[in-house]
């Protein structure tokens, strides 16, 4: 990261950037495959940190810990903040010298109105209902969803 006081960088792997091994790790549905998907996110984090800082997380014991609310942090590198998200075959990670949060959502089929009722404020619900097309509603809802998830992950509240 440079010498900037507040800096964060986002890294991601898309399906076309991943090896067959990565693809198997992130596209699974069983509990074990989901754990492997999570480990893939941490491998991306380790790759980022090794490239930018020459820290080798894989050689550090218990390198990633969690706060009481579940927010992950680097035990030996408290000056670095990170967050990981995965959805579908995508993995994203943000790394910075300030607290960070990130969320990505694959635009899968969902029950739009039912989901919107759960996550939208009254004003957001009004806007959602005014959107004219199904695609527009879906885009709006996923945008709201990812912003809220990112914020929760940034603050570490109720993760």
Language-model features: locations:
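Core catalytic alpha/beta fold that binds nucleotide/phospho-ligands
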Residues: 1-159
